[in-house]
Amino acid sequence: MPESTIPALLGRYRPQHVIGRGGEASIFKATDELLGREVAIKLYRSGGEEEMAQYRTEQAALARLSHHGIVSLIDAGIDYTAPKDPRPFLIMELVSGTDLAATLAQRELTVEEIAEVAYDISEALEYVHANGVVHRDIKPSNIMLVSYGTTTFRARARLTDFGIASGIRNAPATPEDGKTTGTAAYLSPEQALRRPATPASDIYSLGLVLLECFTRSVAYPGDAVESAMARLDHEPPVPGDLPGEWTRILHAMTASDPAARPTAKQLTPAFREAVIAAAGLQPKA
């Protein structure tokens, strides 16, 4: 069905225009006609088996998670306008800003901004992991830098896209035969080996994201196979001249052994101190 002919979903959410596209879904800016507010619609392109599995996984994950570091789920359903091609959708809060990938393509981040991203996402992952969920696809394009439209509040990093999360009822704990979970450039070594992802896998991926924030280059470039296999051969090159404790922290986050990586609970206070140090402030007594 042409996107321009999509009706109001659930009788109240009317799509306006596309604001993003992914491999399985399009994101629309839309109007909640009942409450008179703007929302986002994630509309899957088909109701095939793979799309339905991702829809169910993301719906279940977001329904049980409520945190300021995660883009919130409002509603969900299936569009039966074309009976032979039903399409699942998620109604989510509409956030103003850009994703981290687009920001890195445009400009260099300050150390303070990197520390803020690290703190925000680590805090979100601390909550996610405490609830038994593993994201499995931490990457710059899944981190939104949300603007509040005022100079009083800084942009906040928020985590999106739980379509392949694990720890959800009926979501596979291990990859299907011949498949990996996640995006090649940001996979943990255990994901590259098609082993189950754990909270430590998310920490590794976040470490690669933060390293990219400093270097503005992908640690493991190349095609999917080349990129995935490179991390089994060597750990990522972390510059030795990063400010403060950054070199040590990034080495720890990207350790080959999952057991050697810090947890999100351990990282969150460290990143809070990094924000304070970068801002030139002193912690309160």
Give each language-model segment a name.
Residues P83-D99, T103:
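Conserved short submotifs of the Hanks-type protein kinase catalytic core
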Residues D202:
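Conserved catalytic-loop aspartate of Hanks-type protein kinases
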Residues S122-V133:
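Protein kinase catalytic-loop region centered on the HRD/HxD motif
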